[in-house]
Each structure stands twice: as C-alpha cells, then as structure tokens.
Amino acid sequence: MRYLTSGESHGPQLTVIIEGVPANLEINVADINEEMFKRQGGYGRGRRMQIEKDAIEIVSGVRNGYTLGSPITLIVTNDDFTHWKKIMGADPISEEDQDNMKRVITKPRPGHADLIGGMKYNHRDLRNVLERSSARETAARVAVGAVSKILLKQLDINFYSRVVEIGGVKDDLEYDLDTIKSNIDKNDVRVVNDEIAQTMRDKIDAAKKAGDTIGGVVQTIIEGVPVGIGSYVHYDRKLDGRIAQGVVSINAFKGVSFGEGFKAAEKPGSEIQDEILYDTTNGYYRGSNHLGGFEGGMSNGMPIVVNGVMKPIPTLYKPLNSVDINTKESFKASIERSDSCAVPAASVVVENVVAFELAKALLEEFQCNHIEQLQSQIKERRLLNIEY
C-alpha cells in the first residue's frame, strides 16, 4: 500500500492516489469527511479554516460504495483558490503584473522550508517553496489515513487521539482507556480534563495576543493490533521505526516516543519492562504497558501508544529577523496567514498518519487481493496468541 499527494496550499486542489487497498472494502465518503472535519477544528486555528470546507471527492477506485482493488484517487478542493487564481494559476504572467509581484516572497521565515528550499530548487520567489511545504498538505494525508482507518476498523482495530500538553500546560493525569474514549471529543482542545482544557485555551489566547505561537504533545492510542506486526529481523521493517518516521514527517513535528517514552530513561528496568502473563481466554498479555505495545520492533498485542512532539508554528505575527535573498539586507521575516496553535488539529493528523503506516505494514504481512482474505488471515494470527 502506498500513496502520492500533489497540490499547493493556494492551488486549485489537493490530489491523492492510493494504491494497494484490497477490493470489496466498503467506503463511506461521510467517514472520510468526518476525519477531514476534525482536522479543521481545534482551538487556535487561523482564518484559513473559516474559508475551507474540506470534503473529498472520489474519482477512481471505488464503485457503488466498494473498492475495486485498483488505485483510489481522492480530490480535496481548495476554496481559497478563488482569491489566488492569477497568482497560483498555471498560465504565464507578465513581470509587470503588480498584483502578482506583491505576493513575491524574498524574506524567508525562520523555521520554515523557505530559504533552504529556495537554495535547493533555485527559486527566487520563495512562494514556490512555501506553497508545497505548507501544512495544507496534511489534509491529503488525513484523507489517506481515513481510508486506512476504514480498512483497519474492518479488522477490529480502533484509534483514539488526544492532546496531552500545550505550551507547557500538561494533562499528565492517569486515565483508563474508557475515560479517554469518552472525553476526547468533548472540548475544542481534545484534552480529557475540562479544567486543564480551559488553562490551555488561556495559554493559546495569550500567545495569539503576543503575536506568538505555541506547540505541544499529542498522543495516539491503537487498540486491537494483532501480535507480530513488524519485524525484529530487518531495521526497515520495525513497525515502531516506520511509525516514528511517519510522525516526524508531519510539518512541525520534532520528536516521537512510545508508551512512557523518554521517561524510561529515569527508571530502572524493573519498572519499565512489561511482565508477560497468560490466560486461556486472552492468551499472552502484559501486566502493564510501559513500552507502548512494542517489543523488538513488533506489536505485542497491547494497545500501541504513540506520542508526538509538535514545535510552535514558525509563522509569527511579530516576525523574527531574516535576510532578503535579493538585497542581503536584514529585515523582519514575511508574514503568512497562520494558526497560533495547531496542536489539537495535529492530534488528528498524527492519528491518520499512523493509521496509514499500520495498514501498510499489515498488508505487507498478509498478502491479499480482497478484504475477506485479509480478515481470515488476521483471525488466524489472533488465534496464534492463544495457541502458541
């Protein structure tokens, strides 16, 4: 299973082609659009999300509600393109066109791809870099993840994501999984505790007022993953490694951990390793889940717990110093419309990116042409955990 995305932030559309989805999988557009809607939400989002009404259109690979086994093509229209047709259109324009020249960017923003991307691809207008490097592309990746989640749900694999920290305000209380499930969508910061949610909102408001931005930590929990997905044999087949790469490939993500993550460095091994237990109903299981569902690069049957660290968004309304690439003079960096905090929305992005990585690994592990084959093989693997 693989995918390709194309499109610019203010271009006419984002396009996704997904290859390798088994045939006979029931696809409901409303389920995909629900994920798209969640990505647009969250406290701290900017004005762009008031313009876009993200909804996907399926143009290939699905007929009468079921996948065909051929490549699936999805389109997400950029409503804001209406205001950018001349600037972002494919047709040549005159250098004397003043409307376009006003949008030329020569002052790169610290923390963005602007300067290095301009150097690498020899662009003198840095808009050619920022349009593709924009986090707008994550809308396409969420669409891919939504299809992946539909597939995984047919295998009784379910996802939950939440915010655990924004701008130093932490929701680090211990919750059972049922409490997390029932509370994550009850407020606009996607945090379990409502009192902590308000403190986070206040933190976001203060950053916005100061022309600044803040980051945070998000968590994705996956329930129902069968044992042995991934491999200890080869470095590039370790499932936790593949998930880690997927997470840090998301715009502004600078770190990833599993289970207790970096806290493991503070504790002795006796408090971090998860004891192995057995009963005739569940088979092998662990007495705890400090390692977040992984051993040796493979799923061990416990819930997979992925933590991702998002840096503050680098576009600031009180910009930092930069240098004009034409004059080499010092200036304040360019300002683009942006969010003051996108951590709640990013939790949705991480969830869907992880869903793709897991679906891809499963389809490599269990070769199949249609969903019924896959379901049969997953059932056998689950029995292995009891019978071994």
Curated annotation (Swiss-Prot):
Write down the chemical reaction(s) this protein catalyses: 5-O-(1-carboxyvinyl)-3-phosphoshikimate = chorismate + phosphate
- Cofactor annotation remark: Reduced FMN (FMNH(2)).
In short, the EC number is: 4.2.3.5
Q: Which GO terms describe its cellular component?
A: cytosol
Q: Which UniProt keywords apply?
A: Amino-acid biosynthesis, Aromatic amino acid biosynthesis, FAD, Flavoprotein, FMN, Lyase, NADP
Tell me the Gene Ontology biological-process terms attached to this UniProt entry: amino acid biosynthetic process; aromatic amino acid family biosynthetic process; chorismate biosynthetic process
CDD domains noted in UniProt = Chorismate_synthase
State where FMN binds.
R132, S133, S134, N251, A252, G296, K311, P312, I313, P314, T315, R337
The residues the record assigns to binding NADP(+) are R39, R45
Cofactor(s) for this UniProt protein: FMNH2
**What pathway is this protein a component of?**
Metabolic intermediate biosynthesis; chorismate biosynthesis; chorismate from D-erythrose 4-phosphate and phosphoenolpyruvate: step 7/7
Q: SUPFAM superfamilies of this UniProt entry? A: Chorismate synthase, AroC (SSF103263)
GO MF term list: chorismate synthase activity; FMN binding
Q: Give the family, as the similarity comment puts it.
A: Belongs to the chorismate synthase family.
What is this protein for, i.e. what is its function?
A: This reaction introduces a second double bond into the aromatic ring system.
Listed under subunit, the entry gives: Homotetramer.
Note the NCBIfam families from the entry. aroC, PRK05382.1
Protein name, entry field: Chorismate synthase
The record lists the organism as Staphylococcus saprophyticus subsp. saprophyticus (strain ATCC 15305 / DSM 20229 / NCIMB 8711 / NCTC 7292 / S-41)
**What does the organism's lineage look like at the top?**
Bacteria, Bacillati, Bacillota, Bacilli, Bacillales
| Gene this chain is encoded by | aroC
